[in-house]
Amino acid sequence: SELRVDKIHNEGGDNDSGIDLSTNDQIVLKTAATTRLTMNATGQTTIVGEGGSTTTSVQQGLAKMWVNYTGITTTAARDSLNLSSLTDSAAGQTLLNINNDMNNDDYSGYYYTNAHANTSYGNFDNVYAGGFGSFTTGQCGNNAYGSSGNVDSYNNFCGIFGDLA
């Protein structure tokens, strides 16, 4: 069976909250007569921010790939999203192979490493660092540096943001 309507609203309350289906090819969610969420025919979704005056694109704010991995003994992901594999390319250097490619190589991201072979999070002085080494649409590289050079690290956390292809 099928239900065909233009609007669903709160009949028992103040009558200014509900779902508006009357606009062309989009769904509009309103509360207190104000649009709070819009989803268009392509799935692009915008939502009103905390202050109520700005909107945020949900897709733009989501991580497109993230991974928690170890580089000790055998480089392996503990958990991930949109990651097809990891490649141990050298001591302290790992290539992250993205399952669904990015739209271009200008995306942004974060990378944390403890730059140590144990589970410690205490290596925060200036001789320990981690960063991105390369960006392509299907891959990014991480590099972990310890006090004596590149080092395979136990704790590595990486995420990237941007548009998928």
Could you tell me what each predicted segment is?
Residues 63-165:
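Extracellular attachment/recognition segments
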Residues 1-78:
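Intrinsic low-complexity, repeat-rich intrinsically disordered segments enriched
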